Amino acid sequence: MLVVQMPFSFPVAHFILFVFTVSTIFHVQQRLAKIQAMWELPVQIPVLASTSKALGPSQLRGMWTINAIGRLGNQMGEYATLYALAKMNGRPAFIPAQMHSTLAPIFRITLPVLHSATASRIPWQNYHLNDWMEEEYRHIPGEYVRFTGYPCSWTFYHHLRQEILQEFTLHDHVREEAQKFLRGLQVNGSRPGTFVGVHVRRGDYVHVMPKVWKGVVADRRYLQQALDWFRARYSSPIFVVTSNGMAWCRENIDTSHGDVVFAGDGIEGSPAKDFALLTQCNHTIMTIGTFGIWAAYLTGGDTIYLANYTLPDSPFLKIFKPEAAFLPEWMGIAADLSPLLKH
């Protein structure tokens, strides 16, 4: 008797469903395995790229930053120093969020921000800087360096002057507000021929300089000499005075020529207005302090500063070198130290 065996029959639709289910389960398992592997990886500090013109498209390793200490002038010095030293050493530079909050509302700065959450995960090597350039700073070791100190010296960054001026370009609305104010000024009914920004640093320095640093702040005589220097050299100058001691300025600056305007608001917590006014002038009279130094540096033109304002044995001279703070072409007028000698 002939027996014919029929092949096992399995519906095609069921077969397709079976294959799809198995494939899906396999794919999900693979994805879960990858995610688990990523979770198990240790946290890595990124290697960051830079568009540094000096180094071209090469990758720059590590991360350099600087402590944000002090007010506007200090933080401008810290920013410019970080910018220059990082470029000199071929490292990417990042600024603290605090520094960004101080500078970004005023200037078109370009360095990226290092937020605190990221900074706390990095094994920093603290590196103290003097307030002047040292040869050893050209070859600073370490990939993750955080600078400390109060650097504010042209010796760090003057070779990059045009780049620094670009970094500290005022935002349009800040510049335009200052220029609008200056356009409205007159000298004895006529438009000024030259604008001279005057910054008079007082505030805490009035007490700190004589009591801590064996020094003085600018007095009436110094300011009179500085104003007369410009009056003798320029036709119809106008002096735009800013200060954190405006009441003292009104009492001690001679206004009999009709060429002095007390323009600044002197608010230390929001210095943009005063700083913008100074930098939109043609020349600068400063007294002491980094605010005035930076105003003069960005303005260009002629600059007069208070010179020799401490006694020779002042501890201030251990952390401050006048020749590293004031450009060689600026003109200093010696301070009157007699009030210190009386005591």
Swiss-Prot record:
Gene Ontology cellular-component terms listed: Golgi cisterna membrane
Transmembrane regions listed in the UniProt entry: 15-28
Catalytic activity: a beta-D-galactosyl-(1->3)-N-acetyl-beta-D-glucosaminyl derivative + GDP-beta-L-fucose = an alpha-L-Fuc-(1->2)-beta-D-Gal-(1->3)-beta-D-GlcNAc derivative + GDP + H(+); a beta-D-galactosyl-(1->4)-N-acetyl-beta-D-glucosaminyl derivative + GDP-beta-L-fucose = an alpha-L-Fuc-(1->2)-beta-D-Gal-(1->4)-beta-D-GlcNAc derivative + GDP + H(+); a neolactoside nLc4Cer + GDP-beta-L-fucose = a neolactoside IV(2)-alpha-Fuc-nLc4Cer + GDP + H(+); a neolactoside nLc4Cer(d18:1(4E)) + GDP-beta-L-fucose = a neolactoside IV(2)-alpha-Fuc-nLc4Cer(d18:1(4E)) + GDP + H(+)
Gene Ontology molecular functions: alpha-(1,2)-fucosyltransferase activity; galactoside 2-alpha-L-fucosyltransferase activity
Glycosylation sites noted in the Swiss-Prot or TrEMBL record: N188, N282, N308
Pathway it works in: Protein modification; protein glycosylation
Cytoplasmic side: 1-14
Membrane topology of the entry: Single-pass type II membrane protein
Compartments (UniProt record): Golgi apparatus, Golgi stack membrane
UniProt-listed Enzyme Commission number(s): 2.4.1.69, 2.4.1.344
Lumenal topological domain: 29-343
Keywords: Glycoprotein, Glycosyltransferase, Golgi apparatus, Lipid metabolism, Membrane, Signal-anchor, Transferase, Transmembrane, Transmembrane helix
Swiss-Prot/TrEMBL GO biological process terms: fucosylation; glycolipid metabolic process; oligosaccharide biosynthetic process; protein glycosylation; regulation of cell adhesion; regulation of endothelial cell proliferation
Keyword Membrane: yes
Principal localisation: Golgi
Role description: Catalyzes the transfer of L-fucose, from a guanosine diphosphate-beta-L-fucose, to the terminal galactose on both O- and N-linked glycans chains of cell surface glycoproteins and glycolipids and the resulting epitope regulates several processes such as cell-cell interaction including host-microbe interaction, cell surface expression and cell proliferation. Preferentially fucosylates gangliosides GA1 and GM1 in the antrum, cecum and colon and in the female reproductive organs.
Family, similarity comment: Belongs to the glycosyltransferase 11 family.
Name the record gives this protein: Galactoside alpha-(1,2)-fucosyltransferase 2
